[in-house]
Amino acid sequence: MQRRSFILKTGIIGAAAITAPQLIFAQEQEEEEVTYSIEELMGKADIDLYGKGINLRKEAHDAFKKMKVAAYSAGIDLKIVSSYRNYYRQEGIWERKYLKYTDDQKMKPLNAIDKIIEYSTIPGTSRHHWGTDIDIIDGYQKTSGDVLVPKKFEEGGPFEDLKKWMDENANDFGFYLVYTNNKKRRGFKYEPWHYSYAPISKPMLEQFRGKNIMRLVKEQQLLGGEHFTAGFLKSYIVNNILDINPELL
């Protein structure tokens, strides 16, 4: 009886040992099966957004709220100045800048486009379309003029303490700086205010880069879009969309 009992117990333990990894693998597979429509990826879908003044997907919203509470203990008020931005809002930003540079400043179209993509994305390709990315400042600090200026996040600037705190703590909450201050990085200029919630934005980027981005951009018929050559768009994809913090790839 004792031997039979031992065999039964070891059999149960063995089955559990086999089943547990299988369950974990099944859960991982289920998580990996989350897919995003091209409309979601390009900011043309209506998605559920959470939080007044936050406007992020649920998981990203919850993570930000926890990070915000933690920052309070360091005397910092994490304030979002930009988060979700749909395609049409991005299109408005693009058109306003294009007309400003070509009409007001008399730039040639190609020069105007190069100027725009120093900081602004081509509509349909913005990470802000995903409900995962935020531009932040310290709400406790008073400053005049444009707040999203790299110098204001440096030593002696109003957001110096915010930058230091985020450098030390943001990753613990799943947020990573997107456009880092890496001299070898190309594409968009350094943005010390722009963070992305990696658990969602990484799979979204992976799915987006699997699409024919060149064709999708050309189909939008954007102002100045006739100057989007194949060479320009290839460079834009490699440098502006993909040359980011490696932790987000």
Give names to the regions the model predicted.
Residues 2-249:
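Extracytoplasmic cell-surface/polysaccharide-interacting catalytic and binding patches
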